[in-house]
């Protein structure tokens, strides 16, 4: 059975479209609202959804995502709650879902148990931003048994290091467009093309750019270099607005539709 991620990128290639990948922190402001946001995202044209697993020490997350992570953890959110939420969401949502979660929380849950439970609840893969290179093979070996994808995350670094990180990549490659934490930025370094060329030389798996894309205009600029754009902080900024939940969910949907139109 092919992984949903591969099928989605095949379909997008056929349509000559780039993937729209929004991020949302699980369980913020609460699990019920996250479910509604995910359903709204698919309706508004998202091609794949990235679900953040809140963690107490999120090294790669900017302030916006950190606020939602600590909010969800303060509500007592556990990984099991996220798994159950995905099971529920899967009754409506057909597009691929990947987790974004730190190695510490995966390891604490139990590596194989985490992969098995994730797959069974309807998750197709995970981005582990702090996965050590030396752990990669062991993690991938277990994931392969379950047709679960470990999505590599690369930053503009040496060609040699990029090659090691993306070796044997499956699904897509998460290309961080700037060195540093996530967040909303207005300008993105103009050497993106050279950087994506280096990644493309190392792997022919689809490349998606994330970290700092905050508007349809920026997404449009980025799309010529990659196969998809990932938008996190700009979405969570809306989720964190002090407005009624129904209105917030509608605003998230509108924002995703606007980005989707330019892709």
From Swiss-Prot:
The keyword Nucleotide-binding does not apply. Pathway: Amino-acid biosynthesis; L-tryptophan biosynthesis; L-tryptophan from chorismate: step 5/5. The keyword Lyase applies. GO terms for cellular component: cytosol. SUPFAM superfamilies: Ribulose-phoshate binding barrel (SSF51366). GO terms for molecular function: tryptophan synthase activity. The active site is at residues 50, 61. InterPro entries: Aldolase_TIM (IPR013785), RibuloseP-bd_barrel (IPR011060), Trp_synthase_alpha_AS (IPR018204), Trp_synthase_suA (IPR002028). It catalyses: (1S,2R)-1-C-(indol-3-yl)glycerol 3-phosphate + L-serine = D-glyceraldehyde 3-phosphate + L-tryptophan + H2O. Belongs to the TrpA family. The alpha subunit is responsible for the aldol cleavage of indoleglycerol phosphate to indole and glyceraldehyde 3-phosphate. NCBIfam families: trpA (TIGR00262). Tetramer of two alpha and two beta chains. This is Tryptophan synthase alpha chain. It comes from Clostridium acetobutylicum (strain ATCC 824 / DSM 792 / JCM 1419 / IAM 19013 / LMG 5710 / NBRC 13948 / NRRL B-527 / VKM B-1787 / 2291 / W).
């Amino acid at each position: 059975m092919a992984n949903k991620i591969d099928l989605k990128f095949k379909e997008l290639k056929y349509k000559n479209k780039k993937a729209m990948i929004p991020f949302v922190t699980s369980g913020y402001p609460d699990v019920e609202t996250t479910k509604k946001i995910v359903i709204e995202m698919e309706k508004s044209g998202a091609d794949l959804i990235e679900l953040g697993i809140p963690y107490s020490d999120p090294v790669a997350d900017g302030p916006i995502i950190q606020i939602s992570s600590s909010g969800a953890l303060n509500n007592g959110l556990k990984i099991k709650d996220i798994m159950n939420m995905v099971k529920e969401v899967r009754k409506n949502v057909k597009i691929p879902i990947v987790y974004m979660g730190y190695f510490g929380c995966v390891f604490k849950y139990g590596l194989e148990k985490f992969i098995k439970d994730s797959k069974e609840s309807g998750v197709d893969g995970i981005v582990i931003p702090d996965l050590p290179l030396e752990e990669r093979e062991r993690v991938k070996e277990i994931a392969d048994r379950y047709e679960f994808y470990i999505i590599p995350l690369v930053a503009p670094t040496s060609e040699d290091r990029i090659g090691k990180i993306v070796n044997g990549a499956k699904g897509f490659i998460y290309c961080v467009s700037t060195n540093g934490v996530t967040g909303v930025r207005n300008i993105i370094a103009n050497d993106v093309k050279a950087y994506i060329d280096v990644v493309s030389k190392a792997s022919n798996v689809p490349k998606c750019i994330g970290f700092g894309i905050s508007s349809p205009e920026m997404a449009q600029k980025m799309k010529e270099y990659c196969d998809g754009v990932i938008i996190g902080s700009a979405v969570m900024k809306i989720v964190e607005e002090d407005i009624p939940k129904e209105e917030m969910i509608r605003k998230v949907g509108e924002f995703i539709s606007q980005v989707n139109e330019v892709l």
